[in-house]
Structures are given as C-alpha cells and as structure tokens.
C-alpha cells in the first residue's frame, strides 16, 4: 500500500489496493472494465487485466 500511495496515488487514481478515487482495489478485470475506468489512468478505459496495460506507470516492477 505504501508503494501505491507513492506511484499511483500521485496520479490521483491509485491501483492495487489503494485507489485514489476508489477505483483501484485490486485491478480486477470485471469491476474496472465494467466501470470503464482502467486503474492508474482512470477515465481512459485501460484494461485492468494486466499490469502492462498501464504502460510506464507500472514499469517499476510489473512492466
């Protein structure tokens, strides 16, 4: 959660248990894709199925 606050929290969306706007609980395929808000880049419909969908945002250890 500490890393989430730093990286994703800084984006204002969060991902993987943090959720800056309440969307990033665990980046599950179903929940977020149904909402149309990919975690990490909320509002742009990034597939939250895989970490790599965030491009460079998760490059720290998931890309």
Curated annotation (Swiss-Prot):
Keywords: Keratin, Repeat. GO terms for cellular component: cytosol; intermediate filament. Transmembrane segments: none annotated. The keyword Repeat applies. Belongs to the KRTAP type 19 family. In the hair cortex, hair keratin intermediate filaments are embedded in an interfilamentous matrix, consisting of hair keratin-associated proteins (KRTAP), which are essential for the formation of a rigid and resistant hair shaft through their extensive disulfide bond cross-linking with abundant cysteine residues of hair keratins. The matrix proteins include the high-sulfur and high-glycine-tyrosine keratins. Interacts with hair keratins. This is Keratin-associated protein 19-7. It comes from Homo sapiens (Human).
